[in-house]
UniProtKB/Swiss-Prot annotation:
Record localization: Mitochondrion membrane
Signal peptide, first to last residue: none
Gene (UniProt): MT-ND3
The organism's taxonomic lineage, starting at the top: Eukaryota, Metazoa, Chordata, Craniata, Vertebrata
Keyword line: Electron transport, Membrane, Mitochondrion, NAD, Respiratory chain, Translocase, Transmembrane, Transmembrane helix, Transport, Ubiquinone
Family to which the UniProt record says this protein belongs: Belongs to the complex I subunit 3 family.
Protein name: NADH-ubiquinone oxidoreductase chain 3
Molecular functions per Gene Ontology: NADH dehydrogenase (ubiquinone) activity
EC number: 7.1.1.2
InterPro entries: NADH_UbQ/plastoQ_OxRdtase_su3, NDAH_ubi_oxred_su3_sf
Membrane topology reported for the UniProt record: Multi-pass membrane protein
TM stretches of this protein: 3-23, 56-76, 85-105
Catalytic activity: a ubiquinone + NADH + 5 H(+)(in) = a ubiquinol + NAD(+) + 4 H(+)(out)
Amino acid sequence: MNLLLTILFITTILSLILAIVSFWLPLMTPDYQKLSPYECGFDPLGSARLPFSIRFFLVAILFLLFDLEIALLLPLPWGDQLPSPMFTLLWASALLIMLTLGLIYEWLQGGLEWAEK
């Protein structure tokens, strides 16, 4: 109990000291460039309706699909503890086959080709 009170006292004092020091430190006034928004590769003061390549959008959607696939397949090692592990294997195989067929379809349609033909 004594150790708990000591740790609580030290953390409270340390937090108060850091809060007081942060108010005493001089504040820097930012200039115009630091106040303007920054987006990598885009002029923040230009038009908000810049043309956007649909290929970036397609790659982002594919990334989200495969990221979701990983999230669904991560608990599979614990699936062998279920009453019927073959059922879990069947659903995991169906998911992988469906995503593989979708990737092949996207590849054949040219959605993964970056260069214009």
